[in-house]
Amino acid sequence: MSSEPSTTGTSPRTPRPGAQKSSGAVTKKGDRAAKDKTASTLPPVGEDEPKNPEEYQCTGVLETDFAELCTRSGYVDFPKVVTRPRVQQSSVPSASTSEKPVLDDQRPSASCSQSSLESKYVFFRPTIQVELEQEDSKAVKEIYIRGWKVEDRILGIFSKCLPSLSQLQAINLWKVGLTDKTLTTFIALLPLCSSTLRKVSLEGNPIPEQSFSKLMGLDSTIVHLSLRNNNINDHGAQLLGQALSTLQNSNRTLVSLNLAFNHIGDVGAGYIADGLRLNRSLLWLSLAHNHIQDKGALKLAEVLRPFELTHREVVERRRLLLVKGTQERSRSPSSSRYGDSKAEREKSQTLGISNVTLVDKQEKMQSLKAPKTISKKKEKTGEVVKKEEKLGSGQSPTQGTPKKEDAAKAGKGKVTIPEQKMSKGKATKMGAKEKRSILLESEQLVVEATEMVNPLLEPVEHRDGKVFLPGNKVLLHLNLLRNQITEVGLEGFLTAVQYQVQVSKPKTSPKAPLGLLWLSLAKNCFDPQCPTHVMIQELMLPRDPVKAKAREEEAAAT
């Protein structure tokens, strides 16, 4: 009996072989976990180098470049670049298919319904919609961002990937929450983009500072600008009017400006009219759906007919005339050599002095045919140099060639001389592409030449001691739909339209401005059948190019 308790007492003290194995297995598992942990902390081969977005070279494919730059910048959940969907005609479902009941076995499962639900909400995720060129499926033509806030981070990435898009033509930002800071950043990246970028649309982005006029700076290349639904008030209209033109400078690139659906009143319309006084590039202007009444309408109509110059404008006109007269005198044939370089002037002076000395020697040897002119030349040394240069250049054929070169150099800036140079010097060097685009370039040169002439230098009319400048005949399209204009404002537009119709009748030059071709005054505070409105429509109907073309097609068909 004593042996049994001894056996029972010693049994728990002796270690079991199974327990030793289990503890050994635990230690092995712990060592393995530690090894795995240390192995997981080690960086993989090839990923120890940091990815710097500055080192990335854009390929010109916006989808690839934008995703790579966002990844390198640490941007995880970034918008995707997708192709803008085309507007398709919705097909009406048939009655047989719409009336069929949905059976229980035909209903989607839980997984299918979840995936379909996610696909539906993908529409609301931020995306960058692009419109591609038809010839090149990867070349982005237009960019559309709609309904999500664009921050400085995204604009910084755009500043790196947008310059590589060689075919980019338009950027459209609709309700993207722009601020004055982000607008400044956006304007700074526009010069980095391709020269093909001509259209910018910022709609639904109200900014308290009303700083949209920064888009119309002197160095801006924007041709078409849309600022609809931005809560632009009279203060914003004042900034936009000053961006259109002032006494010192004017915008020469903007062709169309859309200011519809804003809060511009009579005061703001007056500021826009002041900008149109000396602006000769804007062709298309929309002020529809604003708060313009008769006072603002009369200010706009006044610009379209001869208007009186203010005192400051008269003073500036006199200054410009003085500068123009000085330039014309400096470009005259007698003093054309003074426009050349210093070396050429010194050379011409030495040639003139040598000619004078030769004439003096010949006077001592023999009498000349024109002694009176020579005696006059001796009295004034400056006239001696100029006239003897002409005499020397006319005596020998070798001196006649440099005279033509000097005349060509002195005539730089004129219209005729560059045409001669293009026809002689560049005709043999022109390629096929240059020949193809020569008409477009010539049209651009003509437009630039007309724009470069300051409107204050146009022919004026003096009446009752006042100076009147011809009205703005460059503006072709004016939209004043849905404002608060009455028949009082209509009278002003009737006078302006009658003047423009009378002036544009004698077509002396095909390059002359056509004047107003389209005017919309519908949905205002007057009867559409009132005599003034009917008369305006009758005067504008033959001038509308769209309706005139339709009438020509109908006449040709009959």
Curated annotation (Swiss-Prot):
Where composition is biased (Basic and acidic residues), the residues are 28-38, 339-348, 380-391
Among its keywords, does the record have Glycosyltransferase? Answer: no
User: What are the Polar residues biased-composition ranges?
Assistant: 86-99
Q: Which UniProt keywords apply?
A: Leucine-rich repeat, Repeat
Alphabetical list of Gene3D superfamilies matching this protein: Ribonuclease Inhibitor
Q: Which SUPFAM superfamilies does the record match to this protein?
A: RNI-like
Positions annotated as LRR repeat? 196-216, 221-241, 253-274, 281-302
Annotated region (Disordered) at 1-55, 86-112, 325-415
Compositional bias, Low complexity, is annotated for: 1-18
The record's section on PANTHER family has:
LEUCINE-RICH REPEAT-CONTAINING PROTEIN 71
Q: What is this protein called?
A: Leucine-rich repeat-containing protein 71
Q: Which organism is it from?
A: Mus musculus
